[in-house]
Amino acid sequence: MTRNGPDDATRKGTSEVDAVEGLLAYAHSRSRWGGAALRSLTEAIALSRTLAGKSPEEHTVLLARCLRTTAGHLLKRNRAVQALPLAQEAVALTRSIGGAPLVVSLTCLASAYEALHRYSEAAATLAEADAITPPDD
C-alpha cells in the first residue's frame, strides 16, 4: 500500500509501532521546508513516548530514533537550537543500551554541536562515539 498521508499510518487496525514507523516514513517523504514533516515527527515522538512509558525495554530505541530523526530534520532546517535538546535526550536514552543506537545518537548530537559552533564539544562527542567497540559477530 502506498502511503498518501499521515492518516494512513494511524488508521484503525495499525499497531502503535507500525504507526510510529509510518509517521517517520511519511516525514522523510515530505519537503524539509513544509510543516507536514515536522508535525508527523512530533506525533511520532508523542506515540513513541507512550510506548516507551508502557514498555521501556522494548520501545526506548524507537523513541530515541524518533528524537534523532526529528533533530536531524531540524538541523537541515537550520534550527540547531531546537535540535540540541532532542539529540541530547536521544543520547541519554541510549547510554544504557550502548552499541549502534548510542553511536548514531552521539553522531547526531555532534552534528547539533557543530551547527551551534561548539566544536570542542562536537569533537569530544565524536571521540566518544569512535571509542565504542562494535559487538563481535
What are these regions (language model features)?
Residues 14-17, 54-57, 61, 100:
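Residue signature of alpha-solenoid helical repeat architecture, marking inter-repeat boundaries
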Residues 19, 24-26, 44, 51, ...:
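Structural register within alpha-helical repeat arrays
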Residues 28-30, 55, 67, 74, ...:
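Residue at a conserved register position within TPR or TPR-like alpha-solenoid repeats
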Residues 45-53, 88-93, 130-134:
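Amphipathic alpha-helical segments of tetratricopeptide repeats
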